[in-house]
């Protein structure tokens, strides 16, 4: 069975192992989640597991969602996300998913929405080199040339230019699970995960071996 769970980001801290080596970790509140729907190739064209996380009061749920949760026999949830698994049939509607599906040492992928930085210049957005900062220079933090003249007569797609930075879907792969706290539904992951505090993060076992 493929392992996956929804979590919210609490923040970062650091811990020491038995050898005194410091490790930066991200603390996540993972689950408990509920399976609200199991999609199959025959009925939906693809196999996936729909998971709900975070109980909310009934007044925050619209009528179609109320019916959906009632049909699954679960409480109203704040977040609903799908995990596409070939073996989705291993899950059952109403099943509870807890953080103990993972163990210390597992490798997981974390998907979330990165922090929005607003409209930024090309140097901050893409890491371009700046020009001379001397008094006589007329080129400080410009992006430089964005193309030739008549030929090709256009700016190529993907050219590094100023624009909206951040607030996009990001997946960080092969993160190591450092510690599991089953009693408090906490999972400690080595390194950073996308998004600000309280952001919703999708955690699933890694798709790459990392070798």
Swiss-Prot record:
Pfam families linked to this entry: Ribosomal_L3
A single GO molecular function term of this UniProt record: structural constituent of ribosome
Protein origin, superkingdom: Bacteria
A cellular component term, taken from the record's GO annotations: cytosolic large ribosomal subunit
Keywords per UniProt: Ribonucleoprotein, Ribosomal protein, RNA-binding, rRNA-binding
UniProt feature coiled coil, ranges: none
One example of a Gene Ontology biological process annotation: translation
PROSITE patterns: RIBOSOMAL_L3
Role this protein plays: One of the primary rRNA binding proteins, it binds directly near the 3'-end of the 23S rRNA, where it nucleates assembly of the 50S subunit.
Membership in a protein family: Belongs to the universal ribosomal protein uL3 family.
HAMAP family per record: Ribosomal_uL3_B
Subunit structure: Part of the 50S ribosomal subunit. Forms a cluster with proteins L14 and L19.
Record protein name field: Large ribosomal subunit protein uL3
Species, as recorded: Lachnoclostridium phytofermentans (strain ATCC 700394 / DSM 18823 / ISDg)
Gene it is expressed from: rplC
């Amino acid at each position: 069975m493929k392992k996956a769970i929804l979590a919210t980001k609490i923040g970062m801290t650091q811990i020491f192992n038995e050898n005194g080596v410091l490790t930066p970790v991200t603390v996540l509140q993972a689950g408990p989640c509920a399976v609200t729907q199991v999609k199959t190739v025959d009925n939906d064209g693809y196999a996936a597991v729909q998971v709900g996380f975070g109980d909310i009061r009934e007044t925050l749920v619209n009528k179609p969602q109320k019916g959906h949760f009632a049909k699954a026999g679960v409480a109203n949830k704040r977040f609903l996300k799908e995990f596409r698994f070939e073996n989705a049939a291993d899950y059952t509607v109403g099943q509870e998913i807890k953080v103990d599906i993972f163990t210390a040492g597992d490798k997981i992928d974390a998907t979330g929405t990165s922090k929005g930085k607003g409209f930024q210049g090309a140097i901050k957005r893409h890491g371009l080199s700046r020009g001379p900062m001397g008094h006589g220079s007329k080129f400080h933090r410009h992006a430089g040339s964005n193309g030739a003249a008549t030929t090709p007569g256009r700016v190529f797609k993907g050219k590094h230019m100023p624009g909206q930075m951040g607030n996009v879907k990001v997946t960080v792969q092969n993160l190591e699970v450092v510690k599991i706290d089953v009693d408090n539904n906490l999972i400690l992951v080595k390194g950073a995960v996308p998004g600000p505090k309280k952001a919703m993060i999708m955690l699933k076992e890694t798709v790459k071996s990392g070798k």
